[in-house]
Swiss-Prot record:
The keyword Cytoplasm applies. The keyword Transferase does not apply. This is Elongation factor G. One of its GO terms (cellular component) is cytoplasm. GO terms for biological process: ribosome disassembly. Belongs to the TRAFAC class translation factor GTPase superfamily. Classic translation factor GTPase family. EF-G/EF-2 subfamily. SUPFAM superfamilies: EF-G C-terminal domain-like, P-loop containing nucleoside triphosphate hydrolases, Ribosomal protein S5 domain 2-like, Translation proteins. Residues 10-285 form the tr-type G domain.
């Protein structure tokens, strides 16, 4: 029987679980699903059976790639969980999830502390102002240090941690947690699956530490919450209820981040973390109105309250292909109600869409529901044109919500189908995957006719090619990864003139343009392009100006040095001339394109390459080797740290020097070092290396 999703918004929590690759995020999610009564058998990631990791590759690799959305219930509250991937190649997935969440649980590894990926995700969450609580996981592991992790939350994440629990014991003696809000001990005996725990008095040998940390908790809150400040100054001891209310206010205002601890794998500390989700993270009501603008006019701002009575507004934040259902579109509903069969407007594209079925998702099972209201996250079947980041709304009350920004891909590979039969399957596969993942891009190389796919890193492309094989049965050969170089200019050139004329029998062609070209104001890799029209006195008729602009943009696709796209330039159209009969849009497009190329040649063009931010963790004895190797890859060392006896080296290294690094690093350190890497910026390629790249590109 289809159900109707709850309408008491105060009792809804939309949360994400975010973390570094091995901090134990999927295990934590699994435990949540188990204790909230959805899974009867706990799924273990290292057995490859976890519910949230439902794609075949995830189960093999033990990493979460797609954010599966799951609904569960805890103490009368409905919690919608979006599982987010922790690997840096999947930042787009994290970005997508954060855009539609109200709160998040950041999971940290008590041994490794705050790792680079955690920082990346934390910065993304800061950008979307998502309130968070922290769960310091793996307290049972050798080398676990709760307080060091809390210190790193301050130094690496610039956050204000609010310690609301202390660990009771550590490593193999980890028994449970000390609850500083209610001043009691929570003890897990280790029997069964951790479903039950005992609430006991705090042991005498831990009481002093608990009191000291509780005082710190109250002092920190007083600094960030007026009501707590008054109680503090008047010398009143706050009640548990007053403390919880103050923690909730300060957390939702993004002033503090409550810190809890436990061991998901050993089934300890997960239920109190669920209580904290309910107690401290916001409901859709706390987040308030969502703001969008009127289609076609961004200056007219529109507000929608999180209420079923408002006009319907939702954001499509994820698209997935399901073998049986076809295309599934995940929606976050901000206002109004959605019913199966409804006709909606895709305001981003200005097109009508019809909803087939509305589904509530569990990691890879689903149930049909009749309708869902504001604040809910659902999947729908039947949308044809909607892509990630589009707004769906009531056709009578159009609104466009802010979309998401996706980074441009930094790595390309050529892909060729093995047989003629694979050719058609390949284009279907590529189209489907590109619909799901905006950072996966495809184009055809004009010169070689090859299909080029581009993504955020080697792992990203490996997994996409793997999915083509598994889900679409495409056998394909994949070339070596290529770097996505860009070109730009370093100086301004003025008055570059080009006249395009062809006057041989029949209709002629004539167009003259004069342009200035100069570097834009953005960072080196910005795709920025600006076109300024300074034509006066009708020297070029108005209707031909866009053609000049289009010609310049077309010329930018193939730079003058090595045919890579040009970025970050400003074109100013200063002057020109036309012919009453022979001028046309095409003539001005050609003139614009040729003038741009000529100007670019004169404007000191340079080649840009993607620079990656690399962090290597290595035992002390290999440190010299690792640094020497990074230097030989044109790397610049930015910082060195020591964390729990492991040396951490941060460096900026060109992507072209990082191919195959994983094997080299293993060989150098006997497999004991690990690294992570993410895109940092574009920078100019040194002249000697640029010359080689240009020669190669020109086939010399």
């Amino acid at each position: 029987m289809p159900t109707v999703l709850t309408t008491d918004l105060a009792k809804v929590r939309n949360i994400g679980i975010m973390a570094h690759i091995d901090a134990g995020k999927t295990t934590t999610t699994e435990r949540i699903l188990y204790y909230t009564g959805i899974n009867y058998k706990i799924g273990e990631v290292h057995e490859g059976s976890a519910t949230m990791d439902w794609m075949a590759q995830e189960q093999e690799r033990g990493i979460t790639i797609t954010s599966a959305a799951t609904t569960c219930h805890w103490n009368g509250y409905q919690i919608n969980i979006i599982d987010t991937p922790g690997h840096v190649d999947f930042t787009v997935e994290v970005e997508r999830s954060l855009r539609v969440l109200d709160g998040a649980v950041a999971v940290f590894d008590a041994v490794a502390g705050v790792e680079p990926q955690s920082e990346t995700v934390w910065r993304q969450a800061d950008r979307y102002r998502v309130p968070r609580i922290c769960f310091v996981n793996k307290m049972d592991r050798v080398g676990a240090e709760f307080h060091r992790t809390v210190d790193m939350i301050v130094t690496r994440l610039q956050a204000v941690p609010l310690v609301v629990q202390l660990p009771w014991g550590v490593e193999s003696d980890f028994r449970g947690v000390i609850d500083l809000v209610a001043m009691r001990g929570l003890y897990w005996s280790g029997e069964g699956k951790g479903e039950t725990y005992d609430i006991v008095d705090i042991p005498a040998d831990r009481l002093d530490a608990a009191r000291e940390w509780r005082d710190r908790l109250i002092e920190t809150l007083a600094e960030h919450d007026d009501e707590m400040m008054e109680l503090f100054l008047e010398g009143h001891e706050p009640t548990v209820e007053q403390l919880k209310a103050a923690i909730r206010r300060a957390t939702i205002a993004n002033k503090v981040t409550p810190v809890l601890c436990g061991s998901a794998f050993k089934n300890k500390g997960v239920q109190p973390m669920l209580d904290a989700v309910v107690d401290y993270l916001p409901s859709p009501l706390d987040i308030g109105d969502v703001v969008g603008y009127q289609p076609g006019d961004e200056s007219v701002l529109l507000h929608r309250k999180p209420s079923d009575d408002e006009p319907f507004t939702a954001l499509a934040f994820k698209i997935m292909s399901d073998r049986y259902l076809g295309k599934l579109t995940y929606l976050r509903i901000y206002s109004g109600r959605l019913t199966a069969g409804a006709s909606l407007l895709n305001a981003t594209k200005g097109k009508r869409e019809r909803i087939g079925r509305v589904l509530r998702m569990h990691a890879n099972k689903q149930e049909d529901i009749e309708s869902a209201g504001a604040g809910q996250i659902v999947a729908v079947v039947g949308l044809k044109l909607t892509t990630t980041g589009d707004t769906l709304c009531d056709p009578d009350h159009p609104i466009v919500l802010e979309s998401m920004t996706f980074p441009t891909p930094v790595i390309n590979v050529a892909i060729e189908p093995k047989t003629k039969a694979d050719q058609e399957k390949l284009s279907t596969a590529i189209q489907r995957l590109a619909e799901e993942d905006p950072t996966f891009q495809v184009h055809t190389d004009e010169e070689t006719g090859q299909t080029i796919i581009a993504g955020m890193g080697e792992l990203h492309l490996e997994i996409l090619v793997d999915r083509m094989k598994r889900e679409f049965n495409v056998e394909a050969n994949v070339g070596k990864p290529q770097v996505a170089y860009r070109e730009t200019i370093r100086r301004k050139v003025e008055g570059v003139e080009y006249t395009h004329k062809k006057q041989t029998g029949g209709a002629g062609q004539f167009a003259r343009v004069v342009i200035d070209l100069e570097p834009g104001g953005g960072a080196d890799g910005d795709t920025g392009y600006q076109f300024i029209n300074k034509i006066t006195g009708g020297r070029i008729p108005r209707e031909f100006i866009p053609a000049v602009d289009a010609g310049c943009q077309e010329a930018m696709q193939f730079g003058v040095l090595a045919g890579y796209p040009m970025v970050n330039v400003v074109v100013t159209l200063q002057d020109g001339a036309y012919h009453e009969v022979d001028s046309s849009e095409l003539a001005f497009k050609i003139a614009g394109s040729m003038a741009f190329k000529e100007a670019a040649r004169r404007a000191d063009p340079v080649l840009l390459e993607p620079i990656m931010s690399v962090e290597v963790r290595t035992p002390e004895e290999y440190m010299g080797d690792v640094i020497g190797d990074l230097n030989s890859r044109r790397g610049t060392i930015q910082a060195m740290d020591d964390i729990a006896g492991t040396r951490v080296i941060r460096a900026l290294v060109p992507l072209s020097e990082m191919f195959g690094y994983v094997g080299d690093l293993r060989g150098r350190t006997q497999g004991r070092a690990s690294y992570s890497m993410e895109f940092h910026s574009y920078a100019e390629v040194p002249r000697n290396i640029a010359e080689e790249i240009i020669k190669k590109a020109r086939g010399e």
